[in-house]
């Protein structure tokens, strides 16, 4: 494994530059479709807001690859794939059967399961692979990234979004950090740990930042309530309302494979 591990959220700051593993290396049975919102109950109700944000993500990706074959790992209900479809030949992999079935009803090519050798072989080589808020959920992120790299065409790109364990927000909040949510999140990454994994696989980091995102107000409320130890609500009338948010604790990383 390219990254090293800490043993507790209170580890020293030097350790925060490395990947941190929660000792629960299994996929929770209660994981929400796509795993994108830590059990957030109204993912489908937030479709208008999410698709607006995903449209921005597509525009960003096209700076690095304007067209070609695109795979979204952990595609949930396919909202990102819908936005990418005008520019790419899209496919997805989704662990939740209900969400994957929904995608297929929208004429999206989505396989149910993990991004394993079997599913990736069925889909074939890709020019773009996205793991949007997914890597932290996986039992073996290094192995998944290695498989994705194998099925990435020369010169292709991988887009990763995940929490930044070295961020100021993570340091200040500690165990109450909004993204410190075991068992949904099994791994916590820093830029250094992602760079180590990527370099070992022959990938180079082409871009890194902490972008602003348009987030459903209901998700903001959900995370605040959870951080305060309050009972989280289900669906909300504010799911369709978006709010620009940036706590500078979520990374966006573009990796490129050598041509």
Tell where the protein language model's regions lie, with residue ranges.
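Short catalytic micro-motifs in class I SAM-dependent methyltransferases
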Residues: 132-139, 184
